[in-house]
Amino acid sequence: MNPSEIKKLRTESILKELIPEALANLDDENLKNLCVVDVECKKGRYDAFVYLDKMFFNVHEQEKILSSLKKASRALQNYCMSEQGWYRCPNFHFKFDDRLEYQNHMDALFEKIKKDKNES
């Protein structure tokens, strides 16, 4: 692992801790309780994709939350910069995490294949 990869992983780890703290400091009740599942920085650390837990939000609520997060993005960046003493913070791109649903779907398919194989 080269030094740039280590810096990227360190940044991801720090952001995974700081973003929930920053969200908790906001006045918006919808944003305070969001759960950050993962943070993925792109090469160069100019952009960070922040994956959020869907919990029990419907599509309309998700769109509303993403819109609010886009507006609050600069405040979140300022919080991260002030906490870490950074002169620059990655641009945040928020997404709801579909990986768990995808994994559950794949597991169900494999179980079905296994069951069909045993019946044959």
Swiss-Prot record:
The keyword Cytoplasm applies. Keywords: Cytoplasm, Ribosome biogenesis. SUPFAM superfamilies: Ribosome-binding factor A, RbfA (SSF89919). The keyword Membrane does not apply. It is found in: Cytoplasm. One of its GO terms (biological process) is maturation of SSU-rRNA. GO terms for cellular component: cytoplasm. It comes from the Bacteria. Monomer. Binds 30S ribosomal subunits, but not 50S ribosomal subunits or 70S ribosomes. One of several proteins that assist in the late maturation steps of the functional core of the 30S ribosomal subunit. Associates with free 30S ribosomal subunits (but not with 30S subunits that are part of 70S ribosomes or polysomes). Required for efficient processing of 16S rRNA. May interact with the 5'-terminal helix region of 16S rRNA. Belongs to the RbfA family. This is Ribosome-binding factor A. It comes from Campylobacter jejuni subsp. jejuni serotype O:2 (strain ATCC 700819 / NCTC 11168). The lineage of its organism: Bacteria, Pseudomonadati, Campylobacterota, Epsilonproteobacteria, Campylobacterales.
